[in-house]
Each structure stands twice: as C-alpha cells, then as structure tokens.
Amino acid sequence: MFGGRYRLIDFPLSNMVNSGISEVGVITKSNYQSLLDHLGSAREWDLARKKGGLYILPPFGNVESTLYRGRIEALYGAMSFIKHSRAKYVILSDCDVVTNIDYKPIVAAHIESGADITAVAHTGVYSSDDIKTSTVFNVDADKNVTSVLINPDISGTCTTSLNVFVMSMDFLIETVNDAMARGNVSFERNILQEKCRELKIK
C-alpha cells in the first residue's frame, strides 16, 4: 500500500483501463476482504458498467474449493468467467509489478507476429539477489524466446519477465485445460519453460 490509500493492484488496473480494456477479472488469494473493500464498486477505474466491468474471482483451484497452487490452477478455477468472455485476446498480469504500460501496441505486435504467447520483459543489469526470484528469458536476434530460466543464480545483463503475458483466448483455454489434465499447475515452469521450443514465444 502507498500512502495508506493505494495498493499494488492499482497499477495493473490503471494500465488496463488506460489501454481501453473494459473487462477485467481479478483472481484473489486468501483473506481477500480488504481487497474487496479497496476495489469497492470499481467506479474509480471506470469499471462499474453493465457490459464488461470488474469481476472479483474467488481463490479456489478446483471443485474441492482448495486454494490454487499456481497460475494454471488459478485460471482453471476462473474458467467459467474466461469462457463467458467475448474477448478474442487476453492479458495475464500479476499485481505486484509497478509499471506504466500501454497494452495496445503490445497486443497489436502479438497479433502481427503470430506468436502463441507474447511476454512483457525488461532487459537490464541485475545482481544475483535481484534475479534469484525472477523468470529470465534467453532471446535470439528476432526476439524469440529460446529458453527460460526460473529463479537462476546469475547476474549481469538479463531479460527478466514482468509477469505480463498476451495470448488468444482460445489458446489460453486450450493450454489451461491441457495442463490441468496432465497435473501441471505452473505457467512459468510447465508452459513457458517446458514448451519453449514447441511454442512461439515473443
């Protein structure tokens, strides 16, 4: 929280609204009453509307109503909301990265490239302490992701994931359902890393 009023989730919400996105689903974690109180009616982000709007989704990973263990399981728990959306493309974003991003050119580039997944990343010089809890991409000259490192013990110039991803809604649904059928729950490890050479990731 910043200044007692703002929270980290305000950044991705503002980015989405400023990018013209009118339908946003927030998958919560445990003890989320304070988040509900903070988001209120969603009027602050102009998301209090009859079509689209802000949807608060419970933190359950499956029919047994247990807390989700990873991004894949969280998305599977929100599958009813996802399938009812009329959006053709989806942006997945964590809420703990402070960024100011216009998503419109990113989505346009994703469509033009024909990628399965477009990952938003930052290239910079990092210490080993900075990078040890991050996902790092190795990319070629055409900015295709060639390999993925998770929580690596490295330092220097790295391209690190900002945990923002663009993909088609159809690809998301197919990927989540396939991963769950195989018992996979980690988007980073089971999708980005394991299928890096199979998928086109930009």
Language model regions located:
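Unchanged
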Residues: M1-K202
